[in-house]
Amino acid sequence: EIFDAVSSGAVDAGWSTAGYWAGKIPAVQFFTAIPFGPNATEFLAWYHEGGGKELWEEIYARHNLHPVQCVMISPESSGWFREEINSVEDLKGLKMRFFGLGAKVMDKVGASTQLLAGGDIYPALELGTIDATEFAMPSIDIDLGFYQIAKHNYFPGWHQPASALELLINLDKWNALSETQKAQVEATCSESVVKG
């Protein structure tokens, strides 16, 4: 697991998204995607000008980590479904791969959610282990072939109007960098967010 490996210093850095650490730190879900929450512009305004960055760094420092926001994904699709969805009733009993706080919403309406890694989604659809999935933006989902099995796609994603991805750096390694090196990492990631 990236979180523990970077935190312990087994590796210097890793790439992920904060929502995967919700079991360890529930508050970090607000640094990845919030159902019915802010779009990318609003999230970035809070992150840069509303204290979000400092709060994120404070939370992670307790775990010997330094986060750097490196990617912002615009709205994802609400999912790819084998069967057409016409009402909330159609979600009851649906087996679906779902991420983060959105999974809690889907569970409340009667779906049965599970979190699968990206590479496990297509085989799970193919085998019928899941009936539907959400994962990323439609362009990424299409590259992964979800449409070949789950023909019905709904957009935009209410559960992830914007998604932040992070570069996790071991805090001891981060602190050992020069101010110039830190600025280079921050600038590179900022450029990635802006130009995606």
Regions found by a protein language model. Give the residues of each.
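N-terminal secretory/targeting leader peptides
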Residues: E1-F43, G51-G196
